[in-house]
């Protein structure tokens, strides 16, 4: 009998080909194969920290699908609810390499992929409800209408069972029919979550609010227990339903190599700390730390630390002083 999961998530994993030299993708001659997928990045990060993680998806019966399954096995992620679908392919993407710290160009080849055919038929109640926590992003609901239905099914069932839910909007505007549909759908999904983790630009686009405090207020009014807003190099702002509010300064990074995956690393830090029962201030501090680690290497998940590595960094005791509580927290 399978041990109960700490965390369950779902989404699309893709093979990713990263250019080995900087420059325009059209001129790239050589690539390195890696794995990509926002939800999977979080699953990998949490598994490396010792959590029992299950990931739900569909992959094609092809070499890319085999690569995804091999990665799951290597990372210790439960794949018993990953379906190998012979009818559709596994998606892939190309990513440029930038040496100046700017965001790389990413081109996706995912239309009609196996994962886009995820639906409520993939829901397995015992598997999902056996987990303590559900992590969702806004990517999987965007890839198809049926996958979106599954996202709401997962959130509603976990909420009804009294389990905790975190949600990172992780906007992909090109996958949605309109900005209005995207905002309405993702805000409805956020209303089912305990913890909402948008970036500042994402929060502004989704809520129409400008300040971090007002964006957080929007989601708290929908019933969230807490909202953490990523501020890039400035760190992150948090506000909770029980009145805590503050800003945690960002980690200094002298050599930014690959910005993709920073938000997923941040989510790993916040979610892992909350599952350990740590205070929100500590969770945001860890989120900043792991997000900073993620951007110092090539690849979306390669910089995510093991538990031993994280413990060494946190035991240095140099980051707690970076928490700056506002008056509202006292």
Say what each PLM segment does.
Residues 1-78, 256, 321-330:
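Glycine-rich phosphate/adenosyl-contacting loop at the front of the ribokinase-like
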Residues 1-8, 156-160, 208-330:
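Conserved phosphate-binding/catalytic region of the ribokinase-like
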Residues 13, 169, 265:
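Active-site metal-binding loops of divalent metal-dependent hydrolases
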Residues 44, 92-96, 235-238:
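Short beta-strand scaffold segments in enzyme catalytic cores
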Residues 52-138, 311-330:
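Conserved N-terminal subdomain of the carbohydrate kinase-like
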Residues 63-77, 182-192, 215-216, 246, ...:
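Short, electropositive alpha-helical surface patch
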Residues 133, 139-218, 234-236:
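Conserved beta-alpha-beta core of the PfkB/ribokinase-like small-molecule kinase fold
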């Amino acid at each position: 009998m399978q041990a109960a999961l700490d965390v369950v998530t779902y989404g699309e994993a893709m093979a990713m080909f990263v250019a080995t030299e900087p420059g325009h993708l059209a001129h790239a001659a050589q690539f390195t194969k890696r794995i990509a997928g926002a939800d999977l990045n979080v699953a990998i990060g949490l598994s490396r920290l010792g959590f029992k993680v299950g990931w739900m998806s569909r992959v094609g019966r092809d070499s890319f699908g085999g690569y995804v399954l091999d990665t799951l096995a290597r990372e210790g992620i439960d794949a018993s609810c990953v379906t190998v679908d012979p009818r559709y392919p596994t998606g892939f993407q190309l990513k440029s390499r930038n040496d100046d710290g700017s965001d790389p160009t990413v081109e996706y080849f995912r239309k009609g992929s196996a994962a886009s055919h995820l639906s409520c038929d993939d829901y397995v109640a015992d598997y999902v409800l056996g987990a303590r926590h559900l992590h969702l992003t806004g990517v999987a609901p965007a890839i198809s209408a049926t996958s979106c239905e599954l996202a709401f099914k997962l959130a509603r069932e976990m909420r009804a069972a009294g389990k905790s839910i975190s949600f990172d909007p992780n906007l992909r505007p090109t996958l949605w029919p309109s900005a209005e549909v995207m905002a309405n759908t993702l805000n409805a999904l956020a209303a089912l979550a305990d913890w909402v983790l948008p970036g500042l630009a994402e929060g502004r686009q989704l809520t129409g609010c400008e300040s971090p405090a007002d964006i957080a207020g929007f989601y708290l009014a929908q019933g969230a227990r807490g909202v953490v807003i990523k501020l890039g190099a400035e760190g992150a702002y948090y506000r909770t339903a029980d009145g805590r509010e503050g800003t945690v300064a960002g980690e200094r990074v002298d050599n930014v190599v690959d910005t993709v995956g920073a938000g997923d690393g941040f989510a790993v830090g916040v979610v892992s700390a909350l599952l350990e029962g740590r205070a929100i201030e500590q969770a945001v501090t860890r989120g900043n730390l792991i997000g900073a680690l993620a951007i110092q290497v090539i690849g979306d998940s390669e910089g995510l630390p093991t538990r031993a590595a994280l413990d060494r960094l946190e035991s240095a005791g140099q980051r707690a002083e970076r928490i700056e509580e506002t008056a509202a927290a006292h």
